[in-house]
């Protein structure tokens, strides 16, 4: 059945076939790997050949061996490569010896007859798609020391129950996605993290208890678990993704309106808002979860109780929101909390707030008044500047169209003025040393900027899509002694074949040459220039940064 030749059976031969099994000799390690071949029927892999151990199944070793029915693995085996048994559709059972320390991606995926698998004790992580689409799999014996399960059992439609060992810390993306027969799963007390779609489309799952220590119920975690009605979340959970429980029996049981789990407000159910776009959050609510009210596009005003201490990311991306009063006791306002609220006009930050994220007012085109309570120890709006300034580093975190940047500000924070109406003329203070990424991005009115000599760092995207940027000539654009960005010719999108960095330049900024699609040589001056590690982001194959000596050696 197999090609075989005794003269190939020599220890110093790199590849040979013996008893129908193809091997590769590893001279450096003095061991053998099993290579792909046309394997059929029952296979037994020996522990030793010529007194050297067989330690590895190579990538694709038994890939698509449709007539392989059984295999015996040796106790010397240490590694099972990527897709080693993928699409072995007649293989019903496999015993993996405890000597195996590593299993590759897709190792047993699409083994549609595989019913039982026992995994070795030495495995600490079950890899992506390890048993994906093993539609006959009913029994899995997991090692007691496994810490992470990736999308290992996605699409195992016959799996009805599984015991996860104590010590498990994380379930990865789609870990049990599409396990349509899964009825029971007990999560260990050591579990700390669930990832997106971990249990999505487990249609027969009726109840689940998430252990203490888990803080986040992620996107699509239980999406499509149509029979899931009994859900117990721990007190440690601080956020539930807005899509985590879509198409579950639990969600179906909830009334239209604001949807809560204990003291978390995590989404809105229904189509129309009552009371002309006004909502009141119930007393006792501690957290407004990420994106919780994004679907309330017609929301115009909302009353928050003083029990609220955290507002999540992009919680109020509400097109018509005009009025909101931040409650006393609020401590955290996370990134983008009011992103894309173009009708919001005024906001006051309470004294209790100690953490504010980036992108806070991106797209708030009509925001005119920002005030921080004078007793706040972490932030202020000094000199009625209409901005939020972090005291510890004098960073302007968020501004609006009426902001007057104070003279002692040292940093303009990430996305501080992004997508807002600003004046055409901007004079930055003499104290300023850094402008963070996207600080003025999409400020289309901004035409002229006076940069102070103190400015030493300008991050990527700081002035993208502004009138100032549009006015810059093609080629290298400088801000003080910083090469901020290289601008291709507007119509052709092309650049000159080389760019000589001007004398006196101290820094080439992050993403200075990003996305260039034509070859460009960048020649540095004789003195030292700090080149950001991401200066050529997404253009590494086209942009070459050279010293003058390197340029002289290759120039045409």
What name fits each language-model region?
Residues 32-33:
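Conserved recognition-core residues within compact binding domains
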Residues 1, 7, 18-22, 27-29, ...:
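Structural signature of tandem-repeat unit edges
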Residues 59-61, 82-84, 104-107, 127-130, ...:
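Consensus positions within tandem repeat domains that build extended binding/scaffold surfaces
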């Amino acid at each position: 059945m197999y090609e075989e030749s005794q003269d190939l059976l020599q220890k110093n031969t790199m590849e040979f076939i013996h008893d129908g099994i193809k091997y590769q000799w590893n001279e450096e390690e003095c061991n053998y790997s099993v290579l792909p071949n046309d394997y059929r029927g029952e296979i037994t892999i020996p522990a030793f050949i010529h007194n050297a151990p067989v330690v590895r199944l190579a990538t694709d070793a038994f890939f698509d061996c449709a007539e392989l029915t059984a295999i015996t693995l040796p106790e010397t085996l240490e590694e099972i490569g990527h897709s080693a048994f993928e699409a072995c559709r007649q293989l019903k059972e496999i015993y993996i010896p405890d000597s195996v320390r590593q299993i590759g991606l897709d190792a047993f995926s699409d083994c549609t007859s595989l019913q039982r698998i026992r995994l070795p004790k030495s495995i600490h992580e079950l890899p992506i798609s390890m048993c994906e689409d093993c539609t006959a799999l009913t029994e899995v014996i997991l090692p007691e020391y496994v810490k992470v399960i990736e999308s290992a059992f996605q699409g195992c439609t016959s799996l009805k129950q599984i015991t996860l060992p104590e010590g498990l810390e994380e379930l990865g993306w789609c870990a049990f996605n599409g396990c349509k027969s899964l009825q029971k799963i007990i999560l260990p007390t050591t579990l700390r993290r669930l990832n997106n779609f971990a249990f999505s489309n487990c249609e027969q799952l009726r109840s689940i208890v998430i252990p203490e220590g888990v803080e986040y119920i992620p996107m699509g975690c239980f999406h499509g678990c149509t029979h899931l009605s009994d859900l117990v979340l721990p007190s440690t959970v601080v956020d539930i993704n807005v899509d985590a429980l879509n198409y579950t029996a639990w969600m179906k049981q909830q009334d239209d309106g604001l949807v809560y789990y204990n003291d978390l407000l995590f989404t809105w159910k229904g189509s129309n808002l009552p009371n002309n776009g006004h909502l009141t959050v119930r007393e006792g609510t501690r957290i407004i979860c990420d994106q919780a009210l994004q679907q309330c596009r017609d929301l115009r005003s909302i009353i928050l109780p003083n029990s609220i201490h955290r507002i999540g990311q992009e919680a109020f991306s509400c097109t018509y929101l005009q009025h909101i009063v931040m409650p006393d006791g609020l401590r955290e306002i996370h990134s983008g909390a009011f992103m894309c609220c173009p009708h919001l006009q005024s906001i006051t930050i309470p004294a209790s707030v100690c953490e504010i994220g980036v992108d806070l007012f991106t797209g708030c085109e009509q925001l005119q008044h920002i005030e921080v309570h004078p007793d706040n120890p972490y932030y202020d709006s000094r000199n009625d500047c209409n901005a939020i300034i972090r005291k510890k580093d004098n960073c302007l975190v968020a501004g609006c169209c009426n902001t007057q940047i104070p003279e002692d500000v040292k940093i303009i924070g990430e996305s501080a003025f992004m997508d807002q109406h600003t004046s055409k003329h901007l004079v930055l203070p003499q104290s300023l040393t850094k402008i963070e990424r996207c600080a003025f991005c999409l400020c289309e009115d901004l035409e002229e900027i006076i940069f102070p000599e103190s400015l030493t760092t300008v991050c990527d995207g700081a002035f993208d899509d502004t009138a100032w940027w549009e006015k810059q000539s093609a080629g290298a654009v400088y801000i003080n002694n910083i090469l901020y960005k290289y601008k291709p010719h507007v119509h052709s999108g092309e650049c000159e074949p080389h760019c000589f960095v001007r004398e006196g330049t101290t820094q080439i900024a992050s993403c200075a040459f990003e996305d260039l699609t034509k070859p460009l040589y960048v020649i540095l001056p004789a003195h030292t220039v700090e080149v950001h590690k991401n200066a050529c982001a997404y253009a590494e194959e086209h942009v070459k940064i050279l010293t003058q000596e390197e340029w002289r050696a290759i120039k045409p």
